[in-house]
Amino acid sequence: MDSSPPKTITKALPRFSELKPPLSEDIIEALDRSGFEVCTPVQAETIPFLCSHKDVVVDAATGSGKTLAFLLPFIEIIRRSNSYPPKPHQVMGVIISPTRELSAQIHKVAEPFVSTLPNVNSVLLVGGREVEADMNTLEEEGANLLIGTPGRLSDMMKRMEFLDFRNLEILILDEADRLLDMGFQKQVNYIISRLPKQRRTGLFSATQTQAVADLAKAGLRNAMEVISGAESKSKTSSGLYCEYLKCEADQKSSQLVHLLIENKNKKLVVFFMTCACVDYWGLVLSKIPTLKSISFFSTHGKMDQKGRDTALASFTEASSGVLLCTDVAARGLDIPGIDYVVQYDPPQDPDVFIHRVGRTARMERQGRAIVFLMPKETDYVEFMRIRRVPLQERKCSENASDVIPIIRSLAIKDRAVLEKGLQAFVSFVRAYKEHHCSYIFSWKGLEIGKLAMGYGILSFPYISEVKQDRIGIVGFTPVQGITFEDIKYKNKSREKQRQQNLLARKDKLQQEKRGKRKKSSKEAVDDSNKASRKRKLTGRQRQTIQTAQDEEEMNLRL
C-alpha cells in the first residue's frame, strides 16, 4: 500500500455529458430530468477519478454537490461491473453516513439513478426502525446497494450471513470526520474488514482531521485528493454571506425575534446548543404575538425517528418557516430553498460551524448566515477567520422590542413554559461549561445572570456547578410576588395530574410525620424500660441480688 501523500489535481468545469470517461446515457437523461446540466467543481474533479477506478479523498465545502459526486460514479461502476446484473443478495456497493437523516436523503437522491439499473435493489439501513423489519426486507427482497448508518449496517452484516460482499465494487464514507467524531470507529473498521480490498473507495468530508487521514491511509490505495475551492480564501460556499451579531446575553432573545420578523417570508434554520433549548424556544417563539404568522418546526437527537422525519418533511414542503434544531441537522441535509442560517448558540465543536452554515447557499445559490456572540466571545471571529471562514459584523437592531416580559408572562400563565425554560437554561449552562473552545467561551466569564434574564427565567434555579465554582449572577432580577407552586399548566389534564400528585405527596408527608411521632413515643418507652433494667442491675441492688442467689444455691446444696 502506498502511504505517500495523495496528488492534488484540478480541472475545468464541464457539462455532465462532457465528462471523461463518459457517463452512460441513462444517467445523463436522469440528470436532465432533475435539472442538472453543468458540474460543480467537486463533481468535475471527483467523478472522473472514481470512474477511472481511483480512490479519492475529497475535501469539499458543505453544499458543494458532493452527494452526486459519489452517487454518479457509484451507479456507473456497478453498471460496468463484471458481476452486473447481480444476484438478489449480492452486495455491490455500500454508502456509510453518520446520521439517519443524511442516509435517508442519500437514498432518496439515489433513487432516480438506481432506477436506471434493471434488477438492482437499494436498501436503507438506519436506526430508529425495527430490526426485524430490516432483516425481513433483506431476506425477501435482497440488497445490492446498502445505504445507512454504521451501527445498523454493521449489525445487519453480522446477522445476515447470506449477504455476499465478495464482489463488492465500491465503498463510500460520507462525512468521514463526523463518522469518527461520533464514535463509529469500531463499526466502520468492522464494515471495512468485511469488504474485499480490491474495490474503489471514496472518502468525503468538509473538514480533514488526523483521524480522517489515518483512515485514508488504512482504507484507501493510491488515493487522489480533491480539494474543492482550494484557491478560495473562504472555506464556505462562494454564495454565502456570513455575519456575527455581538449582543448581551439578555438581549439575544429580543434580537432573534426581531431577525425572525424581518425574514418572516423566508426559510430559516436556527441552531441551539441542546435538545432542551430546542424544545423550549420552539414552545416560546410560537406563542409570541408578533411571530404568530410564522410556522415553527423542531428536530433534535432525543426526538423519536418518526417525529424527526415528520418535522423535516413538513419544513421541506413549506414555502417559508423556521426549523429549530441541534447539530442533528448540521450535516448533509439538503433542504431546498433555505435562505438564512442562524446560530443562536455557537457550536461546541468549531468544525461544526462550517456544516451548520452549509445548510444555505448550496449548489452555487445565494444564502446568509449569522452567529450570535456575547461580548466576551468575540475572539471567535478571529478564530474563524484563521480557519478561512470570514465573518462580517452586523449591528444590534435598536428597533428590537424587549421580549423578556412577554416570555416571563408566558411562564407565569403556563407551568409547561416555566419548566421547559428552567430545563433549557440549566442544560445550556452545563453544556457551556464543557465547550471545546473554552479559552474563547470561558465558563468563568459567562454572565449567567444576564443569560437567565434572556431565557425569561422567573427565579434563579439551584445549579451545583454555579455554586461550586462561585459564578456570580449579576444582572438577574427575579420576579416578585409569585408562588411557584400556584403556577398551573394550561393543559387541563396535566394540571389535574399535578394536583393529584401534590395531594399524594402531602398525604405521604403527613403519614411519615405520624409514623415518626409513633415511633418516637415507642422508642421513648423502650428506652425508659432499658434504662430501668440497667438501673436494677447496677450498684448495691446488683450485689444484694447476687448475694441472695448465692445463699439460695448454698441452701439447696445443704
Swiss-Prot record:
Keywords of the record: ATP-binding, Helicase, Hydrolase, Nucleotide-binding, RNA-binding
Positions with a binding annotation for ATP: A60, A61, T62, G63, S64, G65, K66, T67
Biased composition, class Acidic residues, residue ranges: 549-558
Helicase C-terminal domain sequence ranges: 255-402
Region (Disordered): 506-558
One Gene Ontology term of the molecular function aspect: ATP hydrolysis activity
Classification via SMART domains: DEXDc, DUF4217, HELICc
EC number of the protein: 3.6.4.13
Record's compositionally biased regions (Basic and acidic residues): 521-530
CDD domains on file: DEADc_DDX55, SF2_C_DEAD
Any coiled-coil regions, as ranges: none
Catalytic EC class: hydrolase
Reaction(s) the record says it catalyses: ATP + H2O = ADP + phosphate + H(+)
PROSITE patterns from the UniProt entry: DEAD_ATP_HELICASE (PS00039), HELICASE_ATP_BIND_1 (PS51192), HELICASE_CTER (PS51194), Q_MOTIF (PS51195)
Residues annotated as domain Helicase ATP-binding: 47-226
Superkingdom of origin: Eukaryota
Positions occupied by motif Q motif: 16-44
Keyword Nucleotide-binding: yes
One Pfam family it belongs to: DEAD
Locus of motif DEAD box: 174-177
Keyword RNA-binding: yes
Domain notes: The Q motif is unique to and characteristic of the DEAD box family of RNA helicases and controls ATP binding and hydrolysis.
Family that this chain belongs to: Belongs to the DEAD box helicase family. DDX55/SPB4 subfamily.
Protein name, per record: DEAD-box ATP-dependent RNA helicase 49
Organism: Arabidopsis thaliana (Mouse-ear cress)
Gene name as annotated: RH49
